[in-house]
Amino acid sequence: MPVEFATNPFGEAKNATSLPKYGTPVTAISSVLFNNVDSIFAYKSFSQPDLLHQDLKKWSEKRGNESRGKPFFQELDIRSGAGLAPLGFSHGLKNTTAIVAPGFSLPYFINSLKTVSHDGKFLLNVGALNYDNATGSVTNDYVTALDAASKLKYGVVTPISANEVQSVALLALAIATFSNNSGAINLFDGLNYSKTVLPLVESVPEASILAKLSKVIAPDAAFDDVLDKFNELTGLRLHNFQYFGAQDAETVFITYGSLESELFNSAISGNNSKIGLINVRVPLPFNVAKFVTHVPSTTKQIVVIGQTLDGSSPSFLRSQVSAALFYHGRTSISVSEYIYQPDFIWSPKAVKSIVSSFIPEFTYNADSSFGEGFIYWASDKSINIDVASKLVKALSLEDGKFVSLRTKFDNLANAGTFQAQFVTSKEQIPVSNIDSTKLSVVEDVSLLKHLDVAATVAEQGSIALVSQKAVKDLDLNSVESYVKNLGIPESFLISIAKKNIKLFIIDGETTNDESKLSLFIQAVFWKLAFGLDVAECTNRIWKSIDSGADISAASISEFLTGAFKNFLSEVPLALYTKFSEINIEKKEDEEEPAALPIFVNETSFLPNNSTIEEIPLPETSEISDIAKKLSFKEAYEVENKLRPDLPVKNFVVKVKENRRVTPADYDRYIFHIEFDISGTGMTYDIGEALGIHARNNESLVKEFLTFYGLNESDVVLVPNKDNHHLLETRTVLQAFVENLDIFGKPPKRFYESLIPYASNEEEKKKLEDLVTPAGAVDLKRFQDVEYYTYADIFELFPSVRPSLEELVTIIEPLKRREYSIASSQKVHPNEVHLLIVVVDWVDNKGRKRYGQASKYISDLAVGSELVVSVKPSVMKLPPSPKQPVIMSGLGTGLAPFKAIVEEKLWQKQQGYEIGEVFLYLGSRHKREEYLYGELWEAYKDAGIITHIGAAFSRDQPQKIYIQDRIKENLDELKTAMIDNKGSFYLCGPTWPVPDITQALQDILAKDAEERGIKVDLDAAIEELKEASRYILEVY
């Protein structure tokens, strides 16, 4: 049975205009977006990429709403600069654009959206969501989203109940559309609202409400004006704050968050204590005046339920509440706070515990407040994972009853655990974490070793346990039968005895039929939960079965009658005394076992992916086979690609110029190379890099093939590294020249892989020693002193001869080498320039060795062709040509600065007023290594470069470095960097980074001194990096 049914037995919503009776709150929210906006950009989440927009995606693939046409829909990945696509799309449009995104992604949107300069408006539909790396759990993180909203200055609205999610979404859309801000955020419980199935009973305002609002709201209205008009026209009461409880309350709790608000509201409902509750619906802007009006005059204590990321610092909500009371003279009220982190597990008992810690006399009846709850536990790979959904579907058919379902996956416990919690009640209630159920069904005994199942069962409740081992021949009056024969942990038996929980064993082994076992588990549930007889159990099961099922009600009844007699056993209560007396023996040096978790640690939205795809092995082929495939391309699905082994788009370019720029007698070979890209369609931007797919020296490859005994014309088929089902066909010569790094440095795992192939025992022993800790010194000598290549190793170990098919898997592939582009395409539309240094050294044998890629490129003759690709970069010019540019670099790190200066030249030629350009460069000697020196001087004379600060470290007795040149111009750089909002770039090796960063801090410190303020210089540097005004391109 598909996972989709196990998590939602009612199926997907077919369209956005007519929602089903049951669904998730996220589906309800999505319908508002789909019906009221013209464009939607949805960003993927982790684990289940379309978690927050799967309905939007499905609806957009269909015809959509006939009367208005479907909105534009685009699904995107989360990355730096998120938001640029909708920002560009909305340019020139006056409609509101919807962005659907998980809360953890909002920091990536800040730079894109905080400076919207056109008329576009944005509604961010955000599910509070994050991932806790420490615990491996999925969390409801409101803090990250609220922090981003504050930086964007967007208003935020959050539903305080699942019964108002559509209305709040529509309100957020109205605020985004009509308020004087460029956007608003609908922030909701992303975790529970996407994974809880419940009745969709909300009465939604008519679609024309937005049109009506446009007629009565002044342009660029204030947030509260839009809110008030929305409530007035719809008749709703979606105010900033909602008060519940006693009007003479002495203690008032403040909550923010969808589930939190519902649970506290349910907890204090009907309580006679002097308790009040304020749910925050609008956290931003926090209206302090309105908040104070909701605080009863009798209030003595306010308790803020605040979320923080670290669990210690005061929450955002606490600071707002304290400020509101201070500004309105309510300082006699004490303010306390209960702080919780995003991974906090909310449940009725948790709420009771929190309230009781502030009001000891507080009591409430959790069972009556939260309906009847049940828990189903199973392995996430079980064929019976859908049992709970079948039960929920049957419960939903009862008149006058509501049912809610919340499913969870823990990919770690028991190698994959599934839990379904479902509640039936006379009114819709929240599903959090059931902590006191009268019945749990456990489908897999092994789960009891990983989770404290009994802890969430009420005293004198029941547990139905499915055993995959036969029960019928066991002595059920013996403790040993349960522990040794059925594998039930002793700790579990002790727990059920302590709480007097009834235990029923379902004999899953003897049932011997998975489909019938499912029927019987359902029947046991109906019997234990509601006391139904066989006839009524059959009736409930029959109602929930698919109409096409090949089974009759009579056969179900007949099977259940026998099953209850033969396959269900109740553990005798008389045995509980023996359970209580069990003494779990602990070995002498064994530590006290850790307590089992009570609740599932929700680590994913999907089952554990425990299947391993079988990867086909490389194989050799005859030329005739290749000829056959090329002759019948359609039949064999042959594709002809430039480099199918590479995931990026590639281009073939020609060398136009290749010249050395350092003297021939100088020990560093640095060269400038230009490629002709005419007709290739290749484009590049400032700051990007060119990936060179270099080849091995063909004559050296042929030498190796002859030595190894390989035929260069043989054909080898290698699985594509991105899609193992695709086979790439290469000749042996092609593979070793273009694909395999045969002259590269082998890693440790290569030596390990050679051991099985060594036929000589002495060589085998040497290889084995190399990969042990004792052989680390020799291995390092092989790699970093002798610089042995793959080819060298096969010479050193002549008995090691893997086959061709094995060679292509154990030799690492050639990697593309990336070089910063030294040209602007606006100035050189059909060229791309690079500045490269040839890496060389002399090994222990006296051989001159070279870096594979740099040497290959330096030897290219004019007219040579090679494969290249473009790599994006974080290095960009400031948004305005007027903003200054400060560049510092060493050696070939000057390459991107040539591109920047050319771009500034182009800007000036187009009539733009350009800002100051400072260039700081460094090398050892001016005569040998003043790279592009003549160009820099010419650009300075032309008024493009403002100042050149050249530091040639060895041309004078004292060493001079670029940071020294920077410090000589602190006044000018302060004006350029701080006053005129310039950008600072550092390119080249990593070692100058601390010194250059210190020089930049000196600039910031000078500004702070002039303004008479104190600045955290480290934080200021980080802010510059975040704003892309301090950019490091180092290697």
Curated annotation (Swiss-Prot):
Molecular-function annotations in GO: flavin adenine dinucleotide binding; FMN binding; oxidoreductase activity; sulfite reductase (NADPH) activity
InterPro entries: CysJ-like_FAD-binding, FAD-bd_FR_type, Flavoprot_Pyr_Nucl_cyt_Rdtase, FNR_nucleotide-bd, NADPH_Cyt_P450_Rdtase_alpha, OxRdtase_FAD/NAD-bd, Pyrv_flavodox_OxRed_cen, Riboflavin_synthase-like_b-brl
Keywords: Electron transport, FAD, Flavoprotein, FMN, NADP, Oxidoreductase, Transport
Catalyzed reaction equations: hydrogen sulfide + 3 NADP(+) + 3 H2O = sulfite + 3 NADPH + 4 H(+)
GO BP field: hydrogen sulfide biosynthetic process; sulfate assimilation; sulfur amino acid biosynthetic process
Lineage: Eukaryota, Fungi, Dikarya, Ascomycota, Saccharomycotina
Record domain FAD-binding FR-type: where: 648-879
Name the record gives this protein: Sulfite reductase [NADPH] flavoprotein component
Inducers of expression: By methionine deprivation.
Misc note: Present with 1580 molecules/cell in log phase SD medium.
UniProt gene name: MET10
Pathway: Sulfur metabolism; hydrogen sulfide biosynthesis; hydrogen sulfide from sulfite (NADPH route): step 1/1
